[in-house]
Amino acid sequence: MKYLMYLCLKELKINKLTMKRQMIITLALALTMTMPTFAKKAMTKKEIAEKEKAFKNLQHPWKGKKVAYFGDSITDPNIKASKVKYWGFLEEWLGITPYVYGVSGRQWNDIPRQADKLKKEHGDNFDAILIFMGTNDYNNGVPIGDWYTETFDSVRVARHKPSEMVLRRHRHFAMDKNTLKGRINIAMSKLKQMYPTKQIVVMTPVHRAYFASSDKNIQPDEMYENARGLFFDEYVKAIKEVGNVWAVPVIDLNSLSGLFPIYDAGAQMFNKMDTDRLHPNDAGHARMAKTVMQQLSALPCNF
């Protein structure tokens, strides 16, 4: 019995020593990790003042720039659904000079015309282009199409041996004016060659719901397929792909803006609850503008 008590006391003593040793090691590691903090010299008042000044001098990279806006009715200054458009808020908040070319009802095939008008009126004297287009391509049942066509062509290659001619698949941009992707290719090809050094930003169309301006212009909400049997999100998806196909930033307003007129609760951001859930009102445009402003803060306006 005494022997058993002796063994228990001995084991307890060993456990206490082990715990003590672990605590010492842990404390030593903690001190080692915090030593650089203790050793770091505190900033002087002058250094603090300089950092505060630098922080105050930070400004939005698009502040005071000249920006061209291509688009449809949501960009068109003549549409009365809102007194101030998203580009008007950006002008107010960032001092951006807007060159607006959006026209109601236009589709992606109108971008080349808008680009020509910009060139004629301002030449190269601007900083960037924002494109906000696509909702009318959906409404008019434009086929989605393909980004590329393919051929089999001979090309010379050399890889660790003398060069030789081989037959390989060869992609070409599909320039079909009757499809969405073809129209985008035509537009972006023109812009990339016309303005190779300019920042070009594409924005996805926002969600859309019921619109009726007359007996001859009634547009169901996006939960219905269009005349082509395609849903709205298929057009949005294609426009999002432009970023990788043409090396341009894409601002996904369809998701980021939060505008959702499908439900009555979201219709307050649009022109008329009963007849126009297609065009955002002032509140809707302000929300879009805030989203665009934040997204643009991460992008250079000039190169």
Segments from the language model and where they lie:
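Alpha-helical cap/lid subdomain in secreted, periplasmic
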Residues: 93, 115-303
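Serine-esterase "nucleophile elbow" of acetyl-processing enzymes
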Residues: 40-104, 109-125, 129, 264-265
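Short hydrophobic "helix-edge" motifs at membrane interfaces and signal-peptide entry regions
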Residues: 26, 62-63, 270-272
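Bacterial N-terminal signal peptides
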Residues: 26-34
